[in-house]
Regions:
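Extracellular/periplasmic helix-exit of transmembrane alpha-helices
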Residues: 67-80, 221-222, 230, 250-279
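C-terminal membrane-solvent junction of multi-pass transporters and transport-like membrane proteins
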Residues: 158-161, 331-336, 355-415
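Juxtamembrane transmembrane-helix boundary signature
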Residues: 32, 59-91, 101-108
Length: 418
């Protein structure tokens, strides 16, 4: 990764590539950030912090590093080939294998959307007293309407604004608590596995590194338009993309860390376990004051809405890719994929008995599909037939395989610990 940084930012400089020019290209990575500050993350992070204090902050750091490498690789695929991960899967894998991979990814995306919609519904219940099931229908309807009636650029602006609201909300919450920063700093870089933490560790991993984001990032990045064509444009896009990914994933790491720290300093410190987001918000009031629970609920609502939109977009990307097409909300394959995803998500929300447990287990299920998507991505980006001169180097390939192995091992730990 350091070599990538030197190559993209230190080895040469072309005119007009200043800070403002780079800032104009920040956006695709923030769409991915939305996916790992979603309600599923809230449930996993609250469980991690309330049950184990600061001890599991290291998995947030590890997951974010893994995410940076994987998302950069997915974006690399989109830039070098002009095809997203779903399209490349259809083009370069045997038909039956490609359909199986994309089918499992689509089911994982429905599980993702369920978590996002359910989280938004829980926020509506906190704020207005609405029943969770009614809230699920409202959140899904609003999210689908945003996708069906807005271009990508308009949706991107809304989503970036939502990320800002969530980030500022957690800054406000942290200002209300006393954080043991030396202990937090040590926990960010010191792995530990307290007794009973295996399922939470894997759910945090599944909440940060998510398969649908790999499909979404590769689609969004390859759909951006740059002037000119050829290798020079590809190199330029790779420079911008790496900065965008590093910046955006850093924002996500900070917000996820803030969730764990908030839970550790409030619930764990008082001997309470946050096994329900609504109860967690209500419990904040007597500890931190009445404004804290409202801030918590507003941030959760914006997180649920924005991540529901990106989950729906990823679903449309996958179904379009099955037919070797780019995502286009006005295209039949994309729009059907979006609509079916939200219908499936709402149906799941209506039958799940416990919303909080539904959020936790949706993240664990995502982590079980993740190795499939990761190894398909590695297979494609390491192939000169697919990537040409931009195929993965051996060191990068080794790193990616190592990440895939870690994901798989953690999945085995989850299954054997159930």
């Amino acid at each position: 990764m350091l070599n990538h940084l030197k190559q993209h930012f230190g080895s040469r400089r072309t005119g007009g590539h200043g800070g403002l020019d780079i800032a104009r290209h920040i956006g695709p990575g923030l769409l991915v950030t939305v996916g790992f500050i979603d309600p599923g993350n809230w449930a996993s992070n609250m469980a991690a912090g309330s049950q184990f204090g600061y001890a599991l902050l290291w998995i947030v750091t590890l997951s974010t590093i893994m995410l940076i490498v994987l998302q950069h690789n997915a974006a690399h695929l989109g830039i070098a080939t002009g095809a997203c991960l779903a399209e490349a899967t259809t083009r370069f894998l045997p038909r039956i294998v490609g359909r199986a991979v994309l089918g499992s990814a689509y089911l994982a995306t429905i599980a993702t959307a369920m978590a996002e919609v359910l989280g938004g519904a829980i926020a509506l219940q906190m704020l207005f007293g609405l029943p969770v099931r009614a809230g699920c229908v409202i959140v899904a309807t609003v999210s689908m309407a945003m996708l069906m009636t807005n271009s990508y650029k308009h949706a991107e602006r809304w989503i970036i604004a939502f990320v800002g609201v969530v980030g500022l909300s957690f800054l406000a919450e942290l200002a209300l608590v006393k954080v043991d920063w030396p202990q937090a700093a040590a926990s960010w870089i010191t792995p530990s596995m307290p007794t009973g933490s295996a399922a939470i560790i894997v759910s945090v991993l599944g909440a940060v590194v998510m398969p649908h984001n790999l499909f979404l990032h590769s689609e969004v990045i390859q759909s951006m338009h740059f002037e000119g064509q050829g290798e020079q444009v590809i190199e330029e896009r790779l420079r911008y993309e790496l900065f965008d990914t590093l910046f955006s994933m850093g924002v996500g790491w900070a917000i996820n860390s803030a969730m764990v720290i908030l839970a550790a300093t409030t619930f764990f410190a008082h001997g309470m376990v946050a096994d329900d987001l609504a109860v967690a918000a209500a419990t904040l009031s007597p500890i931190l004051g009445p404004a804290s629970s409202t801030i918590f609920a507003v941030a959760l609502l914006f997180a649920g809405l924005s991540s529901s939109v990106t989950a729906g977009m990823a679903a449309g990307t996958i179904t379009a890719g099955m037919f070797d097409e780019e995502y286009d909300i006005h295209d039949r394959h994309s729009s059907i994929g979006v609509a079916a995803c939200f219908v499936g998500a709402v149906t799941a929300c209506l039958v799940v008995p416990n919303p909080f447990e539904g959020l936790i287990w949706s993240q664990a299920l995502l982590s079980l599909q993740l190795p499939i998507t990761v190894f398909v991505l590695i297979r494609l980006t390491s192939s000169p037939r697919v990537m040409g001169k931009y195929a993965n180097s051996r060191p990068l390939n080794a790193l990616l395989v190592g990440i895939g192995a870690i994901v798989t091992i953690l999945d085995v730990v989850l299954l054997t610990g159930m």
